[in-house]
Amino acid sequence: MLKTQEISINVGPQHPSTHGVFRIILKLDGETIVDAEPVVGYLHRGIEKLAEDRTYTQVIPYTDRMDYLGAMSYNLGYVQAIEKLMGIEVPERAEFIRVIATELSRIASHHVFLASMSLDMGSYTGWMYPFRDRELVLELLEMLTGSRMTFSFMRIGGVADDLPEGFIEKAKEYLPKILDGVDEEEGLLAGNEIFLARTKGLAPVSVEKALAWGWGGVNLRASGYKFDLRKNRPYSVYDRFEFDIPTGANGDCWDRFYLRLAEIRQSVKIIEQALEMIPEGPIMAKVPKVIKPPVGEVYHEVEAPKGILGYYVVSDGSTKPYRMHVRRPSFINIGMLKELLIGTKLADFITIFASIDVVLGDVDC
């Protein structure tokens, strides 16, 4: 009888496929993964603790530094939590600008996912196309906020700036190009036999498991569960827009990949409606210069690019949060990586890890 020996290999913390400082120890029986031990914490900066020694307004830039690829949603979730605590009513124009900015940020985040997963699987062309189109999105975000990634654009009570002159015209010019790019990216990979063979049926997740794991966002919808906070529990002015919730059937790597393509189309649809419907008016509510919420606590969730993002804030009546906790979707997503990997092949590890879409700044808050 042939004797075999299990071996352990170390992936990361410096490895191109981990997209940041993440380490995982894989135990192999031949080419089959029999155990996996994720090791996180390399990028921990103590943002929740730092918030306790910052004013409510000073916390805003820290929210950018969690999921820095989809930072606008993190700005939005935080300021909406404080607005809920203080009972602030945000002007309509500011809400429309928030939606436009947040959806642009979502598109940019999904483009990074599409590019990274393609490159991880060996498709260099599949990396180039999304980054080409992401550049159009970043140009619009830079025009609006002055920054390409970490924006600090939201304010408690509104937004930092109004839409600049020429923004609406440029957005209307670029959005059809972004849709054309999505069609190209789909055509490049959706009919590629190698790509399909390496993603379809790989690491499927049932609806029951996804819900038990606390998954949200695209990863949950890939399993066939039609739930999107923007539609099911609308916040801001999302209830004004017509858009669909794309869902998958098998919850496998292919569904998780394809749904992000589909989501870009829906985000473009939302932005186009917002540009047509945006009213005139102020961009900031009348709020005190020094933010001092009443004693109390609040929890608020938004639909971030990587899943459901939640802020829990406790106020003791002072100018600084007594406690802040962030429910970070990347941390939730990565928690089930071990179960996804066991029984799969070593060659599929990178594909599976890429498909759940994590960013390490969001894992290690």
UniProtKB/Swiss-Prot annotation:
It is an enzyme of class 7 (translocase). Coiled coil: none annotated. GO terms for cellular component: plasma membrane. PROSITE patterns: COMPLEX1_49K. It is found in: Cell membrane. It is a peripheral membrane protein. It catalyses: a quinone + NADH + 5 H(+)(in) = a quinol + NAD(+) + 4 H(+)(out). Its EC number is 7.1.1.-. One of its GO terms (molecular function) is quinone binding. Keywords: Cell membrane, Membrane, NAD, Quinone, Translocase, Transport. The keyword Protein transport does not apply. The keyword tRNA-binding does not apply. SUPFAM superfamilies: HydB/Nqo4-like (SSF56762). Belongs to the complex I 49 kDa subunit family. NDH-1 is composed of 14 different subunits. Subunits NuoB, C, D, E, F, and G constitute the peripheral sector of the complex. NDH-1 shuttles electrons from NADH, via FMN and iron-sulfur (Fe-S) centers, to quinones in the respiratory chain. The immediate electron acceptor for the enzyme in this species is believed to be a menaquinone. Couples the redox reaction to proton translocation (for every two electrons transferred, four hydrogen ions are translocated across the cytoplasmic membrane), and thus conserves the redox energy in a proton gradient. PANTHER family: NADH DEHYDROGENASE [UBIQUINONE] IRON-SULFUR PROTEIN 2, MITOCHONDRIAL, NADH-UBIQUINONE OXIDOREDUCTASE 49 KDA SUBUNIT. This is NADH-quinone oxidoreductase subunit D. It comes from Carboxydothermus hydrogenoformans (strain ATCC BAA-161 / DSM 6008 / Z-2901). The lineage of its organism: Bacteria, Bacillati, Bacillota, Clostridia, Thermoanaerobacterales.
